[in-house]
Amino acid sequence: MLTVLGDEDLISLKSGSACIDAPLAIIGPGTGFGAAALVPSQNTWITMPGEGGHAAFAPTTELERELLTLLSQKYQHVSVETLLCGRGLVDIYQALCQ
């Protein structure tokens, strides 16, 4: 469970100070792209699963736009999950090698 992980088990995406009673985002690539929220409630935490992987990939840099162009030749829809899963990480690597 996330609440028993130590600092050495976590990776910070952005520095800052956390609010002890604020919801936490949980994301992770694997066979798909998992996304959930961990929400504090009284003396416990409630897990709220999500479908964040289904969001469309929205490039913001030239490199990301080139990646989208390449992957659009292979996939009809390029979602976050298309990129951030096992197969997608290989696709990103191969695109960067071109």
What are these regions (language model features)?
Residues 1-83, 90, 97:
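Phosphate-binding/catalytic loop of phosphoryl-transfer enzymes
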